[in-house]
Design a protein with these regions (language model features):
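Right-handed parallel beta-helix
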Residues: 1-8, 22-34, 50-62, 76-88, ...
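Extracellular beta-strand/beta-solenoid scaffold signature
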Residues: 8-17, 36-46, 62-71, 88-97, ...
Length: 256
């Protein structure tokens, strides 16, 4: 039940920096925390640590580089029933950036987060490690022009999404309105992708050198400027089982 507001660190963790630590936060609020132009973790930075969040709120935090709200490196990040709204990073991961991290999300929402100037991942950027998301919500997140993954960007990550929804996320001039993935194994079960947009390929999802598996998932009114109104993939394996594609649109090839 703690409140962290308008704190500043020039480098890592605008409010809190964890190193080789085990920390738990319950019903805490983090708002308007920030760091310097090369900093990471606008509110919280966890290095080689275990971080557990329950029923926490992150709003309007900013980072000069990585992770507008949270940055985790070689960390275990376990978040439940938490909300991330209007957080901004200049580089990667508007809300969360993870590098070689294990990220487990349950009942978390990401709304109107943004990476503002370079790279990608309006809500999440994950490089290496694993990602699990159950009953998550990603709405209205965006990445900077020329970067990819309006909601999520990842590379070399094995990821599982269950009953997670992605809506109105956008990549204005690049790939993956909701998600861009380069390498890794991605599984989606009972997920919904609606009204996501890409200025290039993959209105909802762009996969490059990945394994994509979809089960009982719906794609509705997603749009791309070039190829793949819903999904675009290259050098990848793609399987869909009992999925529904409705009113997706591409101005180039492959409306669905």
């Amino acid at each position: 039940n703690c409140i962290f507001t308008s704190n500043f660190a020039n480098e890592r963790g605008g409010a809190i920096f964890l190193n080789d630590a085990n920390a738990t936060f319950t019903s805490c609020t983090f708002s308007s925390n920030t760091n310097g132009s090369t900093g990471s973790g606008g509110a919280l930075d966890a290095n080689n640590s275990r971080l557990t969040l329950s029923a926490c709120t992150f709003t309007g935090n900013t980072s000069g580089a990585l992770g507008g709200a949270i940055n985790g490196a070689s960390a275990a990040l376990i978040f439940a029933d938490s909300n991330f709204t209007s957080n901004v990073s200049q580089l990667e991961g508007g809300a969360i950036n993870g590098t070689n991290a294990s990220l487990v999300l349950t009942n978390c929402s990401f709304t109107s987060n943004q990476n503002a100037s370079f790279n990608g991942g309006g809500a999440l950027n994950v490089k290496g490690g694993t990602l699990s998301d159950i009953n998550g919500t990603y709405t209205g997140n965006s990445c900077a022009p020329g970067s990819g993954g309006g909601a999520i960007q990842w590379a070399g990550v094995d990821a599982n999404f269950t009953e997670t929804s992605f809506s109105e996320n956008q990549s204005p001039s690049y790939r993956g309105g909701a998600i861009i993935a380069t390498s890794g194994n991605l599984q989606f079960s009972k997920c919904i992708f609606s009204d996501n947009t890409s200025g290039a390929r993959g209105g909802a999802i762009r996969g490059e050198s990945v394994v994509l598996s979809f089960f009982e998932s719906n794609f509705i009114s997603n749009q791309s400027t070039l190829n793949g109104g819903a999904i675009s993939a290259s050098n990848s394996s793609l399987s869909t089982t009992r999925c529904i594609f409705t009113s997706n649109r591409s101005n180039g090839n492959g409306g669905g």
